[in-house]
Amino acid sequence: MSRATRAALAGLLGALALGAAAPAGASAEAAAGQAGSAATAGTASAGAPGAVTDLLRQPRVAGEGRLRWFGLQIYDARLFVTPDGVDIERWTRTPFALELRYARKLLGEDIAQASLKEMARMGFGTEAQRAGWLDTMRRLFPDVSAGDRLTGVHLPEGRAVFYRNDTRIGRVEDRQFVEAFFAIWLDPRTVAPDLRRSLLADPAAAARAGASPR
């Protein structure tokens, strides 16, 4: 694999790996088409991991999807919610967990950098805040290999707890950071709208919000 190809792949792997950014030279719209084309509607599946059951009440799968890029499988994503579901219009007030199971190796630095790019693209934070967020993500996110899971648990009051597999790797209490981070997947402005629809596929959850997944 050439250096340019590795750089582009790292951009998209960080792209929605724990952060979303278009590959070098591609527009956000083009990245959405490449990534979202293989996202599939989620259905309830295997039980929630311990990292989720410890923090969420009776967690269940609201939706799941697979991210591919030019035929390469990047990761499988699952969104766990409580019996109350997720309020699509006000998800920042809702407890949930996002689990990503990787299909290939990715550096933690790529995850942090790509996440920051997407937060900035959507207009979250000042330049000074984002510099602090990058430091936080560099401390949080490890390198991952095929089969590894990274899970972010979103809690009320602007808190989040992160796990690698079932080992806790950090906690953040910064409402603006937490909203900006999970917006990468759940905000309507995401570069992978098909994956968002898959994660929010549970019709009962949508009905509770008084809206349907976009």
Describe each model-derived feature in a short phrase:
Residues 1-11:
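Bacterial N-terminal signal peptides that target proteins for export
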Residues 4-5, 17, 27:
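Short linear motifs in low-complexity or flexible loops
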Residues 10-20:
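Bacterial N-terminal signal peptides
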Residues 25-214:
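Terminal leader/tail segments of proteins
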